[in-house]
Amino acid sequence: MKVEDFDFDLPEELIAQTPLLDRTSSRLMVLDKESGEIKDQHFTDIISYLNKGDALVLNDTRVLPARLHGIKDETGAHIEVLLLKQKEGNAWETLVKPAKRIRKGATITFGDGALKATCLEELEHGGRILEFSYEGIFYEVLEQLGEMPLPPYIKEQLADQDRYQTVYAKENGSAAAPTAGLHFTEELLAQISAKGVEIIFVTLHVGLGTFRPVDVEDTQNHKMHSEFYRLTEESADRINKIKSAGGKVVAVGTTSIRTLETIASRHDGKLIAESGWTDIFISPGYEFQAVDALITNFHLPKSTLIMLVSALSDRTKILAAYNHAVEQQYRFFSFGDAMFIH
């Protein structure tokens, strides 16, 4: 299929720049993936679509405050570093600006010297392998010195960095939030659990590649970025039992879907305990083996994520739903409203 087939007109004012005061006060569009019927509801109405014996699968990754501002020791030049992926030990793959100032062997100091870095290797496109030195626990130092790397379409400063974390975020490693989960509060999850729905966690660390535009004309030529995922034995067993008993598996976010479908596609539809890297690209024609329904936000035109949701329903129904969302002034993207495809 052509990438252009997934385009739609989106007024810039519908791109949500800040989160709502209450996580659960966002709107919810409900789409029947077979009939295309659309209902406009509130996010708390999601409870009525979840039944006893279903599984609600959430991604418990935690966004790192991965943007650091430092000084090149040799010259005093200001350097911005964005952490991308942890390598061995204290080495990280990073994006450095301006990259030309940081060559192999250069050193950078952050804050009052609590964190230092040495360039081990130069990569293309501004990438650098940096080795960090510090006292204490790295993630605690990062919390003190780092900034949250918000998506490029969000222009406003975030007053409360916790609003770009889910309430159940636990596993450090993401460069971006699994934004479908931002709508849930602990109270709402407790209400869902009390109904007999099983709350199950997976981990997928979202990479910055999630914001990278698709730069090919035909979808079959697109190469996905890879992201680290983990599914525990307990979570795998619980989901398998629910599916065997006829319960539905409802994924919260495209990251949860990509985790489950990566594993199921390798093991004849069954889920097993597994961790690794996935570059699965889900687009129309893909046959889902693990997931029945999806809670997600509204995605960018011509993105791999709108292709994924089109695979769960179909392209014409999704684009009709998106056009309806524009007409009804839904809020789009990371801090926007939600959609339930079932």
From Swiss-Prot:
GO terms for cellular component: cytoplasm. One of its GO terms (molecular function) is S-adenosylmethionine:tRNA ribosyltransferase-isomerase activity. Signal peptide: none annotated. It comes from the Bacteria. It is an enzyme of class 2 (transferase). It is found in: Cytoplasm. Coiled coil: none annotated. Pathway: tRNA modification; tRNA-queuosine biosynthesis. It catalyses: 7-aminomethyl-7-carbaguanosine(34) in tRNA + S-adenosyl-L-methionine = epoxyqueuosine(34) in tRNA + adenine + L-methionine + 2 H(+). InterPro entries: QueA, QueA_dom1, QueA_dom2, QueA_sf. Belongs to the QueA family. Monomer. This is S-adenosylmethionine:tRNA ribosyltransferase-isomerase. It comes from Listeria innocua serovar 6a (strain ATCC BAA-680 / CLIP 11262). The gene is queA.
